[in-house]
Amino acid sequence: MSRAGEAVGLLEVYGLVTAFAAADAACKAANVTIESFDKNKPANAESLEIPLLVLVKLRGSIADIKAAMEAGEKAATAMGGVLSRHIIARPEADTEKMLKISAFA
């Protein structure tokens, strides 16, 4: 089932285990699906306690995304931490294309 056009939640966290914990908490808290994960090793990775950033991309209604992001952020904060978060209520067509990209694929 395609959820294109629905709201998107973006939660960037430190570490893969933190990303899985955040995604799990988000999916349990609301009717959302995981669009994809993406990863990034920052230029200053050697100076970071956790040298990997993971972006969790979630899909659902705006109300569900808000609830899911809150739960995911809470779970991630208790572990490796959250770098940034953002909600896109109605993604534009070109943004939709970018949401499909994943470094894990």
Report the location of each language-model feature.
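Long, contiguous binding/interaction regions
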Residues: M1-L53, K57-A105
